[in-house]
């Protein structure tokens, strides 16, 4: 069972965020590898790769790699990959997969807000649905650009705010299938005033 919602880490420090991800990593890995991460498998990752420039032969960094699923896809496209995650358990799972199916990926536990790499090392960096779970995403983005070579690129995906509104629910047809998502409070400012 996934125990914590990771949608708002802005009021956490990096240690608390790491603890929450470690608490979730085992279940997350089992469920994702069993095909239950439908948004990743059918929406986010295909869309991400559709707009990703050619990376064959490039040196890349995957920030917030989780159990390494998308990192393995990047390596399969010909990139030489390093990958980091704040969760020791996620990195352990990724390394186990790397040992079973070698792709030359180097995984390590690290904080996106303080990357353990020299400046100007990477041709590109990616962050698949991870930056919104970093306590200081601005710092993580600055760090990503610090380790990129001149002309390198960062490509990332994050969740859209409409998916974390206070009044969100799935609308279902008579067969119980979701046909729409209803959101409320989407245009409400954080201070509670309506935009006019």
Q: What residue ranges belong to the model's regions?
A:
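Class I SAM-dependent methyltransferase SAM/SAH-binding core
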Residues: 59-114
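A short glycine-rich, Lys/Arg-flanked "PGG" loop and its adjoining helix->strand segment in the class I
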Residues: 138-153
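Short conserved AdoMet
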Residues: 53-56, 135, 149
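A short acidic, Gly/Pro-enriched loop at the edge of an enzyme's catalytic core
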Residues: 113-124
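A short SAM/SAH-binding and catalytic strip from SAM-dependent methyltransferases
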Residues: 123-137
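Conserved class I S-adenosyl-L-methionine
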Residues: 6-55, 69, 73, 90-93, 153-193, ...
């Amino acid at each position: 069972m996934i125990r914590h919602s990771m949608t708002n880490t802005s009021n956490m420090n990096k240690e608390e965020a790491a603890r929450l991800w470690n608490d979730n990593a085992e279940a997350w890995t089992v469920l994702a590898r069993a095909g239950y991460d439908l948004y990743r498998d059918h929406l986010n990752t295909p869309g991400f790769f559709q707009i990703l420039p050619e990376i064959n032969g490039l040196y890349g960094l995957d920030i917030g790699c989780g159990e390494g699923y998308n990192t393995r896809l990047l390596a399969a496209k010909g990139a030489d990959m390093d990958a980091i995650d704040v969760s020791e358990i996620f990195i352990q799972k990724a390394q186990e997969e790397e040992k079973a199916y070698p792709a030359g990926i180097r995984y390590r536990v690290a904080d996106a807000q303080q990357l353990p790499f020299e400046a100007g090392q990477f041709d590109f960096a990616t962050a698949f649905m991870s930056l919104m779970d970093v306590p200081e995403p601005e710092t993580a983005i600055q760090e990503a650009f610090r380790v990129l070579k001149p002309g390198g690129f960062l490509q990332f995906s994050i969740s859209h705010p409409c998916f974390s509104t206070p009044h969100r629910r799935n609308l279902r047809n008579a067969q119980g299938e979701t046909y729409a998502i209803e959101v409320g409070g989407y245009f409400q400012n954080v201070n509670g005033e309506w935009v006019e």
